[in-house]
Amino acid sequence: SWWYHKKPYICRVFLYISFPKSQNLTYYIDQFYFKKNKLWMFKLMGAYTFNKSLINDSGLKFIKLFGTGSRDGFSLIPDFSSYVIITSWKNDHFRKKFINKNSIINEIINRSSSRVEIKIDPYGITGSWNGINPFKNASSYNGGKILVITRARVKFNKLINFLFNTSLAARSIKSHNGAEFYKGIGELPIIEQATISIWKSEQSMRDFAYSDTNHLKIINKARKDKWYSEELFVRSNILSLKQYN
C-alpha cells in the first residue's frame, strides 16, 4: 500500500477529505492518482479557483481544492498527477450519494488511475481555517495509526523565510522512522499551504514534533517571526483505509 511508503512519488494521488461541522458527521480522505488526464485535472483545478460553486452537492458542508508538491512532497514544483479536495458532509449517506451520482466526482474517478479512501476520526484540533473550525469532534486517540493535517496561511512579507525552510522540513520528516506518509498540498501557490502525514502512532508523531531538532527550529522561527496569519493542526484516528485500482 503506497500510504505506508515513505516516498510519496511512488503513487501520487488526488486526495479527497471530508470532515463535519458537528460531532455527528463523518470524515473521509480519498486520494486519486492520475497517469493520464493530468491536463484535464489541472484545468478543473483552475476552474474551481475562480468558481467555488463548481463542485457542490446536497449534504456538502465544506470544500477546498488543492494542488500538491512533487518529489518529497514539499517541493515548490507542482505534482500534476496529484490534487486534494477537502469536504465535510452531513453523514455517510450524502457522501455515498455524491460519489455515486455527482457528475464531476464521477468524471474524476473515471479519469483517474487509482483511488485510496480513508475514513478518519479527528480528535485533536487547534486553530482555525478561514475563521472557522471544520473539524469539531469529541473523540480521543484510539491507540492506532494517526493522520495529521496541518494548514497555514503564510504572510506575504514572510514568504522568503518560509520558502527557505521548506526543504529543511522535508528532510526532517523524511528521516524520521515514525512517519509512514507525508505530502505537501496548497490551496494557493505558496500562500495557502497544508500538509498531510500518517504516523505509526501518536507517540511517534509527538517524538518528531517535540524532539526533532530541525523541526523545532522551524517551529520556533515561525512563532518568533510570525510567519502565519492563520494556522490549523488536526490529529485523526484512521478508521479504515481502502485502495481502488
Show which residues each predicted segment covers.
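Alpha-helix boundary/capping residues
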Residues: 101-103, 212, 222
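A common structural junction motif
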Residues: 103-109, 215-217
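Conserved RNP beta-strands of RNA recognition motif
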Residues: 85-87, 195-198
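Short S/T/G/P-rich N-terminal loop/turn motif that feeds into the first structured element of a domain
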Residues: 9-83, 92-98, 109-194, 204-211, ...
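Tryptophan (W) side chains
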Residues: 2-3
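Extended hydrophobic/aromatic segments used for targeting, binding, or gating
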Residues: 207, 214-229
